[in-house]
Amino acid sequence: MNAPAHPALSQEEAFARIRLLRSPNIGPVSYAMLLQRFGAATEALEALPDLGKRGGRQYRAIPAEKVEREVESVRKGGAKYLFHDQPGYPALLREIEGAPPILTWRGELSLAARPCVAIVGARNAS
């Protein structure tokens, strides 16, 4: 459960953010709305089942074990997570509507401030 994050973001909150975004029926827009409403992903995860009942949908968080495996795989690959509200998140990317809430990156992040080319992929490609 070691999700590297900015010091202002606890490991528990970093893990909860990854878990929230990886949960079924939670995309970047609903993720942002839940964080805004509850202030923390830990609180949003606790509220998911009740929100689903009231909305006539079933919302369940992805099992923590799946996220633990992902985090471990990212760590073993030498990569790290960067959240949309952390220092170092690319400023131009942040301006895009629907910008990814979480980036998984490897290498020297400070180079992103210079002109560059990025390769971007989706976990759930259509």
Residue ranges of predicted features:
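Short, positively charged patches
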Residues: 1-126
